[in-house]
Every structure is written in C-alpha cells, then in structure tokens.
Curated annotation (Swiss-Prot):
Its EC number is 6.1.1.6. Belongs to the class-II aminoacyl-tRNA synthetase family. InterPro entries: Aa-tRNA-synt_II, aa-tRNA-synth_II, aa-tRNA-synth_II/BPL/LPL, Lys-tRNA-ligase_II, Lys-tRNA-ligase_II_bac/euk, Lys-tRNA-ligase_II_N, Lys-tRNA-synth_II_C, NA-bd_OB-fold. The lineage of its organism: Bacteria, Bacillati, Bacillota, Bacilli, Bacillales. PANTHER family: LYSINE--TRNA LIGASE, CHLOROPLASTIC_MITOCHONDRIAL, LYSYL-TRNA SYNTHETASE. It is found in: Cytoplasm. Pfam families: tRNA-synt_2, tRNA_anti-codon. It comes from the Bacteria. This is Lysine--tRNA ligase. It comes from Oceanobacillus iheyensis (strain DSM 14371 / CIP 107618 / JCM 11309 / KCTC 3954 / HTE831).
Amino acid sequence: MSEELNEHMQVRRDKLAEHMEKGLDPFGGKFERSHQATDLIEKYDSYSKEELEETTDEVTIAGRLMTKRGKGKAGFAHIQDLSGQIQLYVRKDMIGDDAYEVFKSADLGDIVGVTGVMFKTNVGEISVKAKQFQLLTKSLRPLPEKYHGLKDIEQRYRQRYLDLITNPDSRGTFVSRSKIIQSMREYLNGQGFLEVETPMMHSIPGGASARPFITHHNALDIELYMRIAIELHLKRLMVGGLEKVYEIGRVFRNEGVSTRHNPEFTMIELYEAYADYHDIMELTENLVAHIAKQVHGSTTITYGEHEINLEPKWTRLHIVDAVKDATGVDFWKEVSDEEARALAKEHGVQVTESMSYGHVVNEFFEQKVEETLIQPTFIHGHPVEISPLAKKNKEDERFTDRFELFIVGREHANAFSELNDPIDQRARFEAQVKERAEGNDEAHYMDEDFLEALEYGMPPTGGLGIGVDRLVMLLTNSPSIRDVLLFPQMRTK
C-alpha cells in the first residue's frame, strides 16, 4: 500500500515540476470569487435550460477538485467549497490550449479557480461553463478513495482536515457549532450580560470536583493548574460589581476519555446578581430554545431515536422525588449514613464505605435515574455534601438551591443560587479538605483568596454552567463528543 501511495505522490510531484518549468505558479496567491457553489445553484436552479443560455453573467468560483471525467477536447468536473459542490464543463476551444492542458493534468484534490457562465445540462444539472481555468494549489497527496476512504472513525478524528474534505455532514456539524456559540452570545448580550475573559492558569484549582492538569511557571518558579472551571474568578467579578457576566472558554480536567468526555472542553458560565436558581432555570430554557430556533428553525429536534421538545417550560423535579419515583426509596426521611449505604446495597447501587447520606442519594440518582431522563428535565435540590458552592435550602438544609439539566440521559447544565456567606463557604471548604485527606482527589481545595473576596460581600447571585460541546452534540445529533471537537484528544500513535 505504501509503495502504491508513494507512486501516486511521485506522479503528482512530477506534474508540479512540469508546471514550474512552464512558469506556472502551483501555489498561487489571492483569487477573487464572485460566488460560492450553492449560491449559484440556488440562484439559477429555477431557470430553464433555454433561459440560462440567454444569460451572459460571468461568475468566478474556486474550490477543490472532487471529480473529473471526459476525454479529448472537453470534460466535466465537480469542485467543492465550504457551501457544497457544483459541476464544471470545460472545453478546450473556450479556455485555450494551455489552460486545457492544466485542466487535463489536474488531480483530484487540486484547488482551482474558474470563471465562466451558467448553463444547465440535458439532465438538468446546474453547471458552470468555463471560460478561464486556473490551478491555485497543487495537491501532492491523493484524497481517500470516494467509497473506501475515511471509514476508520479514528482516522477521521486524527486527520480532521480529510474528514472535512470528504464528509459534508462533518462540515455541517462544525458550521452549526459556530452558529450555536454565536446565538448564545447574541442572546446573552441582548439580556444585558457582559462577556469577560479570566485566567486559564490558576494557583488553586476550584469551582468543580475534578482532577486538574498541573504545569510549571518557570519565571515565577511556581506550580499552576489549568482551570477545571471558570466559576471562582467570575464570582470575584460579582463582588467587584459586574452584575451580569459570562465567559465562553476552555476548561481542562485530567480525567478519562469517553463519548461524553474530553480532557479539554468548552464551557459557558454566567452569573447574575440579585437572581436565584429559579431565575436561572428560566434563563436556561429560554437560552437553549433560542439557540435551537436559530440553528434549526424549531424547538423540536431529533437526537438518535428520540424527538426532543425544547419548548419551555421544562419539567422540574427534586432529586429525592426522582429517586423515590424510580426506586421507591424515600430519602426525605431522616436516614443515617450507615442506613443510606445499606439501602444502596439492597437496591444494587454501588457506593463506598466512606460515602455519607448525600453522596448515597447522588449515587442512587446517577445509577438509577439519570439515563432515563430523555426530555429536558431540571433536577434540583442536590445534597449539600456534593454542592460546596451552592446555598443551602432554607426548608431543608440537607439540600441546596441547585439544579442540573438533563436531556437524553445526559447532564447539560449545572446551576446554583450561589453561596455568598463566607463563613458557611469556609466550613464547606474545610469539609472538602477533609474529604481530600480521606482519599477523594476530586474534592475542592481551600481557597483563601476567594474567601477573602467573599468577605467583602457578594450580592445574592444565580450562576450557570453549560457544557458547550454536549449542547452541540444535542443540536447536531452527534453521538460522540469527538464528533463536535475539531481536534479531539487522541492517544499518541
């Protein structure tokens, strides 16, 4: 296979040398286009063959040569740009001998520029009849075979550029991703939020339960952590009086890779002063519905075998009620840590001997309920042990004013009425430090600088974090997070 490939590559290099000997630049410069491929198809598709023959408008397009056929003095080809493909009709007597030799020697994958007029073939295909043909970039490697290339899913991720060339669905996914993030910004800016940027390297990792990546700052000779969340710096801005802020940025967690997880991923976090988690629920469903309408024109989408209705209002369910509905176990009752672990064993829920009541409730939910939540559902009231940055619920202090959003059995968002009591926050951090000492390496660190900021006073605040990659998965019907990351993390070959 390698000898065959090298032979093909040598042929292309020989053609490259021939072009250069003739004074042609096989890696040209700027090329002005008048249209993209699908613009022309949409504009002229309604024209009859005869009507198109009467038009004299010249068009100029450019793209990658994807097919080529024909012998003698005429040939057909398809070129592809970001918008799609369009057919070319190239005749020697129209473009001249030299340009036709360039066309004849062109290989699939070459990037070409064409000026011509529109016409429709006998079978009704909108095409460009070339008057000028120019090689813009010589491709020195053959593309994967049309029907046999890039079937290897791992190759698609490792060589995303080939995937984008050969797979229009993949191109569409990443165009949609850009639209999703743009729509997110438009909505929040329209609601008066201020977009900010905060550091990606932290002296103390915080804002989430996760293992961080560690790096070293040579000039300062200190260890730094790639951020595992955006949260704590944005809360400092709330203390500073920036009342509605958001950030869209990369977050890094030194954890496993799966269809739902990548060590480097994109989040949006936002905070609104004088709001609580009920307000943030409403904002979340309106934000996601707005994005769906912008991308799909509808709040009804398809994901896998499911039809998902994103039209507000979404289901709201307390975590204890969700567990009770699924298993019959009632955690509203006063239950000791030992009794909670015994209930877990009885119902086949995997827990460790160090887990408290709140951790057990969460394990019940994750193992028995989470994957059953197909339509958008806000699960709220998480136990205080697993929510160190959320306000306690005033009616039952075992729980917090927190919610997570689940769609198609996956968490898509996490939000709180933010804890702004520095004394309570210190106690929560101390409990987390104890957990870390007992072996939970995802427990929160003590963060004295953040506590000092809270002591100056943070207004009552509602906060939200959304996993952008998972939202893109949902809105593009993509089964794996790697399908929505241009360059996902891969094991070194």
